[in-house]
Amino acid sequence: MLDLKYVRANLDAVKTALANRNQETLLAGFEDLEAGRRTVLAEVEELRRKRNEVSGTIAVMKREGKDAADLMADMKEVSGKIKDLESGLKEKEEALNELLMRIPNIPHESVPVGKDENDNVEVKRRGEPRNFDFEPQAHWDIGEGLGILDFERAARITGSRFPLYFGDGALMERALINFMLMTHTTRHGYKEVLPPFIVNRKTMTGTGQLPKFEEDLFKLEGWEYFLIPTAEVPVTNIHAEEILEEEALPLYYTAFTPCFRSEAGSAGKDTRGLIRQHQFNKVEMVKFSHPDNSYDELEGMLQNAETILQELGLPYRVLNLCTGDIGFGAAKTYDLEVWMPQQGVYREISSCSNCEDFQARRANIRFKSKGKKGTSHVHTLNGSGLAVGRSLAAILENYQQADGSVIIPEVLRPFMGGREVIEK
């Protein structure tokens, strides 16, 4: 959530930022609401001033034994007007707050201006795509051929866009989770968290999923509970309504969770395979940072995600997302995209974002500096480290052999009983 004082003082800059996000209409009504609020506030303050002034006069008259009944009657009427105006003022402030809840973050100055994903800027590439001496197969065909993925049975059990792993497929999924968590906790300094997979409305609002994106969420019927779309939601809210000590920053957390997304608006996209699922596993990284250091922390988080891809031996590239493609709560986002040989394209496998104080303001996460008065909002960062199903899909495609078998990346072998290959 943006700071209302900032929006008031920098309205033109906010309008430009929203226009760069293709969201220029979101501020419609703000100026009218703000003008109405100021008018009512001025009336309230004038009546309060009058009430205080006349109250003093009444006190003097009473001390002097004079009749103040008429003034007291007037003040009773003024108090009633103040009460009514204060109620109207509260309504306007709530309307402004509701409007702010639907306005996205302001992009950082280093974010390229662009309309959509076609304007994202490639930062770097790492690893050379493999030259196959046979026609590479899609990961779903490889997995079904090896008997480790079964989308047909998954569809019977639940419906489309759900995975079902067998044998070495389930083992590799678990190996990836363990490898990612071990790397982040033992080498990158994160503390592992196992959070709830169901959260309440306030928690979803704190990280920015609500109120704007409710249709993308799975809601429990009859409850104000939601299945999490990412571990970012519960982990960021660990410190909601808390004041942290400055010396405790930065805080690093990592968590494995299943994630649940309705994929509203994705009809016809990635209908096969593990790329776009209603349920998928992900290892998440979350940081709470001092505002002065948050962009250094973003670069570090990006490196942490890159390490996983490098250790797995998967070719990838890094994109700096443009203003038209960046997420709702992010001030800056790097996407990591892994090479998928069968499609001949890079596909997203991680997003690393600095949300600055946008989420912290919504969730009321602050820190106190030693020797200073007051508190400030922390900066929050989140990143995939990585999406597990997509990592497995990338391994199947990049490590496939002509006979249909798949070589297991060396770093996963200790988690898979020393196995070197998956074969029929």
UniProtKB/Swiss-Prot annotation:
Entry EC number(s): 6.1.1.11
One Gene Ontology cellular component: cytoplasm
Record key words, sorted: Aminoacyl-tRNA synthetase, ATP-binding, Cytoplasm, Ligase, Nucleotide-binding, Protein biosynthesis
Compartments (UniProt record): Cytoplasm
Major subcellular location class: cytoplasm
Residues that hold L-serine according to the record: T230, A231, E232, E284, S384
Region forming the signal peptide: none
Enzyme class: ligase
Pathway annotation from the record: Aminoacyl-tRNA biosynthesis; selenocysteinyl-tRNA(Sec) biosynthesis; L-seryl-tRNA(Sec) from L-serine and tRNA(Sec): step 1/1
Entry annotated with the keyword Protein biosynthesis: yes
InterPro entries membership: aa-tRNA-synt_IIb, aa-tRNA-synth_II, aa-tRNA-synth_II/BPL/LPL, Ser-tRNA-ligase_type_1, Ser-tRNA-synth_1_N, SerRS_1_N_sf, SerRS_core, tRNA-bd_arm
Binding-site positions, ATP: R261, S262, E263, E348, I349, S350, S351
Molecular function via GO: ATP binding; serine-tRNA ligase activity
SUPFAM superfamilies: Class II aaRS and biotin synthetases (SSF55681), tRNA-binding arm (SSF46589)
Domain of life where this protein originates: Bacteria
Entry domain remark: Consists of two distinct domains, a catalytic core and a N-terminal extension that is involved in tRNA binding.
Subunit composition and interactions: Homodimer. The tRNA molecule binds across the dimer.
Protein name per Swiss-Prot or TrEMBL: Serine--tRNA ligase
Name of the gene this protein is made from: serS
